A protein has these predicted regions:
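Hydrophobic transmembrane alpha-helices of multi-pass solute/ion transporters
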Residues: 1-86, 98-99, 103, 280-285, ...
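Short helix-coil transition sites and intra-membrane helix breaks within transmembrane domains
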Residues: 75-77, 88-95, 125-135, 163-171, ...
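Alpha-helical transmembrane segments of multi-pass membrane proteins
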Residues: 112-124, 150-163, 189-207, 381-384, ...
Length: 526
């Protein structure tokens, strides 16, 4: 009964968005209200509350869970979404987006390659460096600027922002996953490398299938060409990511793998792709190119310098100007670094780039204010969804859903292990949060199934437990595609207010395929 009650918020959200075609902000807010009521009146009687909170007031527990969710929504998720769209609006205002469009089309006039370059290559790079929605918001906005339809731009950006999310924000999700199951609470480099490699192996077919889907969504009439490009780009992507994961760990697969994909796409475009005979090449000087790309170049510099790839700066930023909010009852403290978050890096990069492009600081602040006002419904959506996820977590609903799946599947559990991770990401919108929620569950089930030794998985030897634990992040990357939070980001980026349900409906078949294939790979490896 607990599992059935716990799944009500997820089902309700689907029904409201898909069945009743209710706008995302209304669906999310109504689902939050229902979730709070379930937590207040059903969680305790059904024994869903975790032992550490069994003696706490359910009213206080639920209330503080909502507060935590709202804090997480604003700091940093909404700030990052706002700044990502602000950066694009600067390009539109300065008209430098026209130069970027011409430069992209000068690489090739093949729309499929352009889309793949943006959502798979550039999007993967953004995910690897920053995460938190930038890899959906920025590529989708650029695609709109290149003349692609909003629905198409939203869908391909969501499909593209998947495999890289496991190693997003310089590897935080997989590092967190390993730390959660490590006996000491801090995973060894060897464990992180092994788990990273396992996740990439489990995702390997999707490195080819997803580029093929993206290319086919762009051009349905050249399937053979699409397959050749997908094989070329996908095999290079997965090979580079595997080498990075196996030897270096979780920090570099998405970043270096995406750079390799960008190079592979450009090489194919220059060597093999046919160019239109009537295409007129337009050249730009270095200063013109620098001016056009200054927004994203400065963003890239700030993210790299402030991130984990630059430890001294990263350590300084993380230990200065940090606000802490104690959350009674929950027994936790919410911390936010004012100078270490990706939102600030986006703001600084975009603003300095805007000044380089000739806009005054006053004009830039007007653009920021206008962008903020236009995102008011997205604010409601994101705040409601993250608060909902927090309530489901502390009331025990998410654990009840996972436990129900374990009980039903038995020895076939590895087949559905990625689904657990996908549910976590669907509810929370975060691969990292999904790993925090379910890493220990996956390790516990591995122990129950007798997966306590070592084995060889598709030619790679390692821990059986780590193989099943890696399945969580494998599924979590697929759940990212249909997470209402990701849908809300795509909706805002493509100016598709009220179209959340349509985007979700379009993405579901690809997400289901993704999660099923991930499950098959995990099961075959056991």
């Amino acid at each position: 009964m607990a599992s059935i009650i716990s799944i009500v918020p997820i089902v309700l959200l689907f029904v409201l968005m898909l069945g009743f075609k209710m706008a995302g902000h209304k669906s999310a807010l109504l689902t939050l209200v229902v979730t709070v009521l379930l937590a207040l009146f059903a969680a305790s009687p059904l024994g869903m509350i975790a032992p550490e909170h069994a003696g706490d007031s359910i009213l206080a527990l639920t209330g503080w869970a909502v507060v935590e969710g709202l804090l997480k929504a604003v700091f940093p998720i909404l700030i990052i979404i706002l700044m990502a769209i602000y950066s694009y609006n600067i390009l539109v205002e300065s008209k430098q987006i026209e130069v970027i469009k011409k430069q992209f089309t000068s690489i090739t006039d093949d729309k499929g390659l352009l889309v793949l370059l943006l959502v798979w290559g550039f999007g993967g790079l953004l995910e690897g460096m920053a995460g938190f929605g930038t890899a959906v918001a920025i590529p989708a906005a650029i695609l709109i600027g290149l003349g692609f339809k909003p629905m198409f731009s939203a869908l391909v950006s969501l499909v593209g922002n998947t495999v890289a999310t496991g190693f997003g924000a310089v590897g935080v999700p997989v590092t967190t996953l390993c730390n959660e199951v490590a006996d000491s609470g801090s995973a060894s480099v060897a464990q992180i490398c092994e788990t990273s490699a396992f996740a990439i192996i489990q995702l390997s077919p999707l490195f080819i299938i997803l580029p093929f889907i993206i290319l086919t969504l762009t051009d349905r009439h050249n399937l053979v060409k699409n397959l050749i490009i997908a094989l070329w780009v996908g095999m290079i992507s997965v090979a580079v990511q595997f080498v990075c994961g196996y030897y270096l760990g979780s920090e570099t697969p998405a970043i270096i793998g995406s750079i390799a994909a960008i190079v592979a796409i450009i090489v194919y475009a220059k060597v093999f792709a046919r160019k239109s005979k009537v295409q007129k090449q337009e050249t730009f000087t270095f200063s013109e190119s620098f001016k056009a790309w200054s927004v994203y170049l400065f963003i890239l510099v700030f993210i790299l310098v402030s991130g984990a790839l630059c430890p001294p700066v990263n350590a300084f930023l993380k230990t200065h100007l940090v606000s802490a909010v104690h959350l009674p009852v929950l027994g936790s403290t919410f911390k936010f670094g004012w100078i270490s978050n990706a939102g600030l890096m986006l703001f600084l990069g975009a603003t300095i780039g805007g000044l380089v492009q000739g806009l005054s600081f006053k004009r830039l602040m007007v653009i920021l204010a206008r962008t903020t006002v236009n995102l008011r419904k997205t604010v409601v959506t994101i705040c409601s969804l993250i608060a909902l996820a927090s309530v489901m977590n502390y009331s025990g609903m998410i654990t009840s859903i996972a436990s129900g799946l374990v009980a039903v599947t038995g020895d076939f559990y590895p087949l559905v292990a990625p689904m657990i991770g996908a549910i976590g990401t669907f509810v929370t919108g975060s691969d990292t949060s999904s790993n925090i929620l379910f890493a220990k569950l996956q390790a516990h089930v591995a122990n129950q199934l007798g997966m306590t030794g070592t084995d060889t998985f598709f030619g790679v030897e390692g821990s059986q437990s780590n193989w099943l634990v890696a399945a969580n992040t494998t599924g979590a990357t697929g759940g990212k595609m249909i997470s209402p939070q990701s849908i809300a980001i795509a909706t805002a980026s493509c100016d598709m207010e009220g179209k959340d349900g349509e985007i979700l409906r379009s993405a579901i078949p690809y997400a289901v395929l993704y999660i099923v294939l991930g499950g098959i790979m995990v099961y075959l490896g056991c």
